[in-house]
């Protein structure tokens, strides 16, 4: 079972806020009245007695202490910036396993926490953006991929591992090779929209599949990983609960935000690796 942290955070803020409000409306006036009554009965009030009469219930004390901190975290995380950790190599070489990234939560519109309803439209995903979204088949799981197809686009991926968008071959330039799990891996520089970035292909690894083509419906996006032969993305999703014409598509309501920076790397196992900052920088 996946932990729904946004829901837990909202509940925690609501509980702490309710405790603070109950104290303000109910308990605090009672404490003030008790202190006033005591002071009217003695000539010299005992500081220890005053402290005892003014003491907040322990639960209220904790609630009032945690409320401002949790509220600030909720606002920052829900509407401004949210941190994520990269769990897989599907976005290599752009993102490595163990990278900690920052995601802009307002780039594509302000959304209500937990409900994820867009209340203030600000912008739309652009081709080439690196985007975090909730996996359509399991919305409690966050994925990160690159936006390849926009609403209305036609995307084609060939058995030769070439990408076409709206009938045009996406430009790519050979960069070099690096070691891979099954032989060498070829690196290319690809340009999607205004975004230039590196992609990885295992040219010696052939997939027995025909050329495939998709037309992106309104309000949906087609996503691919930069590690083209090691990415579970829009090309391969298959869920019988999803209509056939929407298979592989990410609906706008599932968008979490735009990934824009790496702020730390800490690969597993954490106990035998130290955090490092050599990969800190903007995500292209």
Curated annotation (Swiss-Prot):
Pfam families cross-referenced by the UniProt entry: Peptidase_S26
Lineage of the species this protein comes from: Bacteria, Pseudomonadati, Pseudomonadota, Gammaproteobacteria, Pseudomonadales
This enzyme's EC code(s): 3.4.21.89
Cytoplasmic side: 23-58
Annotated protein name in UniProt: Signal peptidase I
Transmembrane regions: 4-22, 59-77
Residue spans, topological domain Periplasmic: 78-284
Molecular function terms, GO-annotated: peptidase activity; serine-type endopeptidase activity
Family: Belongs to the peptidase S26 family.
GO cellular component: plasma membrane
Mode of membrane association: Multi-pass membrane protein
Swiss-Prot/TrEMBL keywords: Cell inner membrane, Cell membrane, Hydrolase, Membrane, Protease, Transmembrane, Transmembrane helix
Substrates-to-products reaction catalysed: Cleavage of hydrophobic, N-terminal signal or leader sequences from secreted and periplasmic proteins
Active site residues per record: 90, 145
InterPro entries: LexA/Signal_pep-like_sf (IPR036286), Pept_S26A_signal_pept_1 (IPR000223), Pept_S26A_signal_pept_1_CS (IPR019758), Pept_S26A_signal_pept_1_Lys-AS (IPR019757), Pept_S26A_signal_pept_1_Ser-AS (IPR019756), Peptidase_S26 (IPR019533)
């Amino acid at each position: 079972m996946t932990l729904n942290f946004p829901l837990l955070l909202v509940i925690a803020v609501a509980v702490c806020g309710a405790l603070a409000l109950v104290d303000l409306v109910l308990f605090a006036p009672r404490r003030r009245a008790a202190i006033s009554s005591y002071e009217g009965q003695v000539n010299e009030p005992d500081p220890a007695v005053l402290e005892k009469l003014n003491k907040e219930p322990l639960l209220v004390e904790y609630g009032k202490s945690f409320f401002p901190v949790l509220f600030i975290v909720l606002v920052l995380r829900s509407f401004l910036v949210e941190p994520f950790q990269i769990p897989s190599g599907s976005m290599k070489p752009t993102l490595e396993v163990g990278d900690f990234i920052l995601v802009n939560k307002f780039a594509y519109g302000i959304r209500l926490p937990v409900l994820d309803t867009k209340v203030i439209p600000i912008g739309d995903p652009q081709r080439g953006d690196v985007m975090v979204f909730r996996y359509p088949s399991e919305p409690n799981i966050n994925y990160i991929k690159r936006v390849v197809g926009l609403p209305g686009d036609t995307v084609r991926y060939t058995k030769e591992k070439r990408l076409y968008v709206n009938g045009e071959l996406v430009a790519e330039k050979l960069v070099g090779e690096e070691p891979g799990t099954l032989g060498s891996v070829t690196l290319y520089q690809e340009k999607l929209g205004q975004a230039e970035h590196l992609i990885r292909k295992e040219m010696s690894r052939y997939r027995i599949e025909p050329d495939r083509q998709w037309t992106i419906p309104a309000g949906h996006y087609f996503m691919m990983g930069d590690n083209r032969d090691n990415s579970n993305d829009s090309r391969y999703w298959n869920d019988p609960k999803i209509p056939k014409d929407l298979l592989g598509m990410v609906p706008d309501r599932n968008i979490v935000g735009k990934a824009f920076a790496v702020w730390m790397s800490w690969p597993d196992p954490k106990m035998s690796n130290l955090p490092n900052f050599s990969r800190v920088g903007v995500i292209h």
